[in-house]
């Protein structure tokens, strides 16, 4: 048990400090904006300090544990703790949220509510990644949905209400299965405190019941990740959301589904995961091809990037399904890698829209000359998205490939077939990625528009882009910086499996 409540402070600081926004003096949006950025920076620095000085990398067990009685009558506990699996997503959340807050500068309507919702979302995401209690995990999972719905419905495009409604129907529908499974799992055959992760991990279930729990949780995570065919909310949501919200969706929210799949399904329900893993591999392989084939047909720039996210998230599903050290480490690395790349692409798409007021690719063209900085950064992140060697996407996807090939669970021919189909998907990625850059930046279409004068990226946009680009290059050159966080925890998780 931790002697000082570091994690509790980290979880509650954003939402509590965010509540003070409504009491700030009415002197324009500048005070609100800088106050929010300072809170995000303080939270990020506090998180980094805690992990640097109080977290042991070589210990696969839960660290900085906190356990407080919450609701005595129901024996509910406030349990928090971190390990190598959660530390990466938590740091990613702090980094992306801070930059998304900086990116939200153009938002002026209801600025107080907007920034409060971003901070509330911050707390929900940190709470989900650090929860050690099934009920607390569910509460944080749901807490994070409400701000997203409001951010979509109030600061989106013309079809924002449709997109927000579709988002909440999909995610709340998936959460119903989570809500049904958690009480059953927490209360089944145990006299110890219910809902504790450790208690649930040591609990053995009948095979049929474990499969039922697994399938229910899988539906909830398949909506968030997303996994086909439960992905259709994502393109609509990204197409209408403000780009700072898109950064949080692509960078963090999608990763919560993959995290839950590892943390609960894989760690707490190993026998069912061993049964379902071939199906995860098959669905993930289909998803790579499907999303990469669908993306080129999208006229909307942000929808095309959204489908590329669906394709790249499939590598995480495949890595989790491989049940190997290499594959799971590759999946965790892809969670971090795509968090940076996806957030950056949506940010640059949004800044481009702010200048040319166009979102359809067939209406764009020729903006490379008037906006060379945006062109350079967008092209760089497009290269990262198509897994160019030397960047994080290449390392993550390559490790997932090795995880499939070295998996003893699958026969030789299925492994070759899956690898071949995934390779086709990787070939399709440059097609939609490079064609997107060609339609945006090359040609002369926008030069024929009267008064076509466009302002290039300013210091704020350049700063955000470089801050995201540096980790992408850093992880691509030295991936062990991220892998060292999770490697011991991955071995501990896979020790429950017979197929290593």
Curated annotation (Swiss-Prot):
Spans traversing the lipid bilayer: 4-24, 37-57, 84-104, 111-129, 134-154, 167-187, 208-228, 242-262, 272-292, 305-325, 330-350, 374-396, 411-431, 462-482
Subcellular location: Plastid, Chloroplast thylakoid membrane
Root EC class: translocase
Catalytic activity: a plastoquinone + NADH + (n+1) H(+)(in) = a plastoquinol + NAD(+) + n H(+)(out); a plastoquinone + NADPH + (n+1) H(+)(in) = a plastoquinol + NADP(+) + n H(+)(out)
Pfam family of the protein (one): Proton_antipo_M
UniProt entry tagged with the keyword Transmembrane helix: yes
PANTHER family: NAD(P)H-QUINONE OXIDOREDUCTASE CHAIN 4, CHLOROPLASTIC, NADH-UBIQUINONE OXIDOREDUCTASE CHAIN 4
The name this protein goes by in its record: NAD(P)H-quinone oxidoreductase chain 4, chloroplastic
Source organism of this protein record: Chloranthus spicatus
């Amino acid at each position: 048990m931790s002697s000082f409540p570091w994690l509790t402070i980290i979880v509650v600081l954003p939402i509590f400090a965010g509540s003070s926004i409504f009491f700030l003096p009415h002197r324009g949006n500048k005070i609100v904006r800088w106050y929010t950025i300072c809170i995000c920076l303080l939270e990020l620095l506090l998180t980094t300090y805690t992990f640097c000085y109080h977290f042991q990398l070589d210990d696969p067990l839960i660290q900085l544990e906190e356990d407080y009685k919450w609701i005595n009558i129901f024996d509910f506990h406030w349990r928090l703790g971190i390990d190598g699996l959660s530390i990466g997503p938590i740091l990613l959340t702090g980094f992306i949220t801070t930059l998304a807050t900086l990116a939200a500068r153009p938002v002026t309507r209801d600025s107080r509510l907007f920034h409060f919702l971003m901070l509330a979302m911050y707390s929900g995401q940190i709470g989900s990644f650090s929860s050690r209690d099934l009920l607390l995990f569910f509460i944080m999972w749901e807490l994070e949905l409400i701000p997203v719905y409001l951010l979509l419905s109030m600061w989106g495009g013309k079809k924002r209400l449709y997109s927000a409604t579709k988002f909440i129907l999909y995610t709340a529908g998936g959460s119903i299965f989570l809500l049904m499974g958690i009480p059953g799992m927490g209360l089944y055959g145990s006299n110890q405190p219910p809902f504790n992760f450790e208690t649930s991990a040591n609990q053995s279930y009948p095979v049929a019941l474990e499969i039922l729990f697994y399938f229910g949780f899988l539906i909830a995570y398949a909506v968030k990740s997303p996994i086909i065919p439960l992905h259709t909310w994502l393109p609509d949501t990204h197409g209408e959301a403000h780009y700072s919200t898109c950064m949080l969706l692509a960078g963090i929210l999608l990763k919560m589904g993959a995290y839950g799949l590892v943390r609960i399904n894989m760690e707490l329900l190993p026998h069912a995961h061993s049964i379902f893993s071939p199906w995860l591999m098959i669905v993930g392989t289909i998803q790579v091809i499907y999303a990469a084939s669908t993306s080129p047909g999208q006229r909307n720039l942000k929808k095309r990037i959204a489908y590329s996210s669906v394709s790249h998230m499939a590598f995480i599903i495949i890595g989790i399904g491989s049940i190997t050290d290499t594959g799971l480490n590759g999946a965790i690395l892809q969670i971090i890698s795509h968090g940076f790349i996806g957030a950056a692409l949506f940010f640059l798409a949004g800044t481009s829209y702010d200048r040319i007021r166009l979102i359809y690719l067939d209406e764009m063209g020729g903006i490379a000359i008037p906006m060379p900085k945006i062109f350079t950064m967008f092209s760089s992140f497009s290269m990262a998205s198509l897994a160019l060697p030397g960047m994080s996407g290449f390392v993550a996807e390559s490790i997932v490939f090795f995880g499939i090939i070295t998996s003893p669970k699958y026969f030789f021919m299925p492994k070759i077939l899956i690898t071949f189909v995934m390779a086709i998907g990787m070939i399709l990625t440059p097609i939609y990625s490079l064609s997107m850059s060609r339609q945006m930046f090359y040609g002369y279409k926008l030069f024929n528009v009267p008064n076509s004068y466009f302002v290039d990226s300013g210091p704020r946009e350049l700063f955000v882009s470089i801050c995201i680009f540096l980790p992408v290059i850093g992880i691509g050159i030295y991936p062990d910086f991220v892998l060292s966080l999770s490697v011991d925890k991955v071995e501990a998780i896979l020790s429950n499996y017979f197929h290593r």
